[in-house]
Amino acid sequence: MEIIPHRHPFLLIDRVLELEPGRRVVAVKNVSMNEPVFQGHYPGNPIFPGVLILEAMAQAGAVAVLSQPEFAGKVPLFAGIDDARFRRPVLPGDQLRLEVEMVAMRRGLGVGKGMAYVGDELKAEATLKFALVDAATPEPAR
């Protein structure tokens, strides 16, 4: 996962299964009971938070985008989330399969369609909007 800037404890993808640079990615997140978030979400009834599923999708999408040589070293930032839907809870022991397809990319701004599955069951989906910035500045890459 050296291609994206995220690190433990906020690196939310464990492995990339398929990659078409700039187009699509399939990655996995193994949801363990040892995740720090389960200390408070929710004790005795642990559920992996939807916002972290969205972040995992975004990190997977970042692998697809940042694997292109022209974007190497850039930092992806959320610019928006549309049509987010959470279908079923994700629980400790689940293997979350993250599928992200890039829909549009122009001048450092992009849109990806993300879906999260456990087995064949769709758990969440969203349209993710992002900006690529230089590591030293908060301005979008041009």
Swiss-Prot record:
Signal peptide range: none
A biological process term (GO) from this entry: lipid A biosynthetic process
Cellular compartments per GO CC: cytoplasm; membrane
EC number(s) recorded for this UniProt protein: 4.2.1.59
Gene Ontology terms, MF aspect: (3R)-hydroxyacyl-[acyl-carrier-protein] dehydratase activity
Reaction equation(s) it catalyzes: a (3R)-hydroxyacyl-[ACP] = a (2E)-enoyl-[ACP] + H2O
Function: Involved in unsaturated fatty acids biosynthesis. Catalyzes the dehydration of short chain beta-hydroxyacyl-ACPs and long chain saturated and unsaturated beta-hydroxyacyl-ACPs.
Family: Belongs to the thioester dehydratase family. FabZ subfamily.
The protein, known as: 3-hydroxyacyl-[acyl-carrier-protein] dehydratase FabZ
The species this protein was found in: Symbiobacterium thermophilum (strain DSM 24528 / JCM 14929 / IAM 14863 / T)
